[in-house]
Amino acid sequence: MKNRILLFLLVFIVSLGSVRAQELRCMVQVVSPSVQGTNRAVFEDMQKAIMEFMNSQQWTTNIFKAEERIDCNIMINISEMIGSDEFKGTIQIQSRRPVYNSSYSTTMFNYQESINFRYTEFQPLIYNPTSIESNLIAVLSYYAFVILGYDYDTFGSRGGQQYFQKAQDIVNMAQSSSNRETGWSSFDGTRNRYWLVENMLNEYHASLRTCMYQYHRRGLDVMAEKPEEGRAAIASSLEQLQRLFRQRPNSFALLLFLDAKRDELINIFTPSPSIEKGKVVNLLTEIDPSNSEKYKKILAER
């Protein structure tokens, strides 16, 4: 009897751990159309290892139900294989958030960048919060926390703070790594991993994070039942972006937000009243001038 009880407790603890470990529902694709004459099995193994890493790692101390997992995608396009274990290419990261009381999911994050990394076939990827084991693990862990930060910010004001801080911890460790790759330093350009998390944690971007909460929780989440009220809340949230743009017109985080939401905003405000249309279009063309022609679609009659 005691053995059965112990066995039950062991199974319970293991199953609880697996539930806690599944914050992300991450689909991974590794492609290599430009790489010829290589054993394709290494890319299949890499894809499997990355998917296992993202979906099985315990990223938070919270318990997620299966339906609460955050949907995300990672696509790695290998353009060059340098030696047997070194790769060069691009990585694209996308994440989505379900909208309350609807079947619609809104894009939260969509970004693509260059990446160089080493990977040994059949070697598991293991996250270490106190050191950088490899650039691939660092990049994947960084974006796992960024995805969590973005998601949590939409459910509570600055709710993702601790996850952006964890992403910044990875930036700091990567900077001091003896094998540091590009993308981790302020000197590696103005749009990279360093600047993204710097933006999200810097006080002058508080207005963006306020917008993220208002846009999603008070806007999108109420639109199914109260479309006018939800749309008005979204319009109001955009004023926070205008405030940021006037202070930091080259904000990387603002650019990423607009890239993720541009088409959605057009769809939301096209059926709105003329006065609301005009106000929103004027605001969006100010903060996103290179896409002003796209926003004119909002003014079309429907």
Positions of the model-derived regions?
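Positively charged n-region of N-terminal signal peptides that target proteins for export
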Residues: 1-5
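Flexible, glycine-rich surface segments
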Residues: 159-250, 254
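Start-of-domain marker
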Residues: 22-88, 99-101
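Sec/Tat signal peptide C-region and signal peptidase I cleavage site
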Residues: 17-21
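Sec-exported extracytoplasmic/periplasmic mature domains
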Residues: 51-59, 149-153, 266, 270
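A cross-kingdom marker for long, charged
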Residues: 29, 213-302
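Acidic/His-rich structured neighborhood in mature extracellular/periplasmic domains
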Residues: 85-198
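Bacterial N-terminal signal peptides
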Residues: 7-16
